[in-house]
Amino acid sequence: MRRNCCHVSFASTLKILNFVQAFIGVSIIIYSIWMLHEYSRHLPVDPPPSASSSSGTEIATSVSEPLKNPIDFVASIILGSNGGDHGFNLRSLDLPAPWFIYSFMAVGILVCIVTFIGFIAAEAINGCCLCFYSILKTLLILLEAALVAYIAIDRHWEKDLPYDPTGELSSLRAFIEENIDICKWVGIAVVAVQLLSLLLAMVLRAMVSTPKPELDEEEDDENPRSRTWDPLLGPQGNQAPAGSSKIENWSSRIREKYGLNQSPPVNPKG
């Protein structure tokens, strides 16, 4: 496939946007590694007393009750009812202590993977790669939108999460609340970069997936060439007798010059 200036310009812009997103992903991974290093140096904070006061009997009953009434359990998850102890609670999950750091690092790795696929798609300018990148980018944007909507709707979202012994979740929330204006503009800029990269990928894929006009133009370019060869071949065939006549004239002149055409004299009979 031929790459015109429009393809190259769109691909270069997509590479720049992916570079910005890769910088964000690498920054998240580096910050997660720093948090994990700081957590390993210091002792973890003791869990709240409510988490340590649960007995084995209560845990067994809380696990067996949803199995006895599965319909009520599913309805409580969908409707979000707090009646009884059937509501799904993330605090009941057995997660490692630095779960927030691992989750934060997973977000950075996911961003880097999607960005790497975007680099490949922008370099190859392939329809399949661009389509796959567009799907991944759409899923990532939808996941971010769902997370923001959940935090905006549920004012007590921290109570639904497991306890964070590292304290990084609370410190991150305090930092965002102190610099809410800057964080808003940074979030808007990140979302704008992601949406613009998705738009460029879709436009570039649409441009790549329609190569038929280019093939027609190539065929039209080839037909005039074949037509131009026809008149050139025709006169050459017609010029062949003229060339042979010139050779005959030249040979006849040579014979006349050297007397080769003169017939020998005939002796008269006496």
From Swiss-Prot:
Subcellular location: Membrane; Vacuole membrane
Feature: compositional bias, Polar residues: 236-249
Ranges facing Extracellular side: 37-99, 154-183
Cytoplasmic side: 1-15, 121-132, 205-270
Expression across tissues: Expressed in rosette leaves.
Main location per the UniProt record: membrane
Phosphoserine: residues carrying this PTM: 245
One Pfam family from the record: Tetraspanin
InterPro entries in the cross-refs: Tetraspanin/Peripherin
Location of region: Disordered: 212-249
Signal sequence bounds: none
Keyword Metal-binding: no
Membrane topology: Multi-pass membrane protein
Assigned keywords, A-Z: Membrane, Phosphoprotein, Transmembrane, Transmembrane helix, Vacuole
Gene Ontology CC, one term: mitochondrion
Ranges annotated as spanning the membrane: 16-36, 100-120, 133-153, 184-204
KW Transmembrane (keyword) present: yes
Effect of gene knockout: Slightly reduced efficiency of intracellular multiplication of tobamoviruses (e.g. crucifer strain TMV-Cg), characterized by a reduced amplification of TMV-related RNAs.
Function, in words: May be involved in the regulation of cell differentiation.
Family: Belongs to the tetraspanin (TM4SF) family.
Assembly and binders: Homodimer. Constituent of tobamovirus replication complex.
Protein's UniProt name: Tetraspanin-18
Protein source organism: Arabidopsis thaliana
